[in-house]
Amino acid sequence: MFFASCENELDNYSAPNGGIKGTILDAETNEPIPLPVQGSTGVIINMWEQNTDATKSVDFYAKMDGTYENSQMFNCDYKIVVNGPFVSTCEDIVTIKGQTTHDLKATPYARINASAQVSGKTITINYSVTPSNSSYTVSEVYGYWNFAPGIDNGSANQAGKQTVKATEGTITFDLSNNANYTSNLYKIKSNGNKLYVRIGAKTEGKINYSKILEVTVQ
C-alpha cells in the first residue's frame, strides 16, 4: 500500500492522520452491493490525491458485504475510483478530515435474491437474477458452497460449484457423498456444522453476487 502526504515536506515523515470508510450502494435500491472475496478476485478501491504531487494511488480491497475501510490515510481531497462489476466506473471526490465516512453509488449488472434451506446434508438454494437493464444478457448462473464465508467464482474460494443457465430456479447440493464435504468433516464439525452458500451471475461478462448465506447441515 502506498501513502502520499498532502501536508508539507516535513509532514511527509508523519503518520497518516485520517481514514475513510463507507459502503458501495446500489444507485437504485440503496442497498449494499455484494462483492467478491478480498484478495486476487476482489474489487480494489483506488484513492487518488487531488492537487498534490502524488503520482500513485492508495489501493485497498473492498469487503464482500460492499463496505470498504482504510484507517491510515492522509487528510486531503481524493478522487475515489472503483472498477467493480458495475455498469460504469464508480467514482467520486471526497475530502478526508480525520476518520471520514463516505458512501458511494454504483449500478450492478444484475441483482440477485437467494434463500437456502437444509434437509439433512442436502442444501437447496432458491434464487432469482434480475438484470439492471432489460437489454443485458445473463449468460451463466453459479451456485457455490464453502467451508468459510469467503465465497466467489475463484477456485480457491469455493468447495463446490454448479453452473446453470436459468435466471430463476433452484440449485441443490447433496453433500452426503461429496468428497470435499467428507474429507473436511472435521473442519465443518469444529465450526458447528456451518456451511456457506452464495449465488453468482455473469451478465455482460461481469459477475455479480448474492449475499452470503449461512446454513447448518445435520
What do these predicted ranges mean?
Residues 175-209, 218:
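Beta-strand-rich modules
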Residues 49-65:
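Short, acidic Ser/Thr/Gly-rich low-complexity loop/linker segments typical of extracellular
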Residues 29-53, 136-141:
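Short, ordered, surface-exposed loop/turn motifs in non-cytosolic proteins
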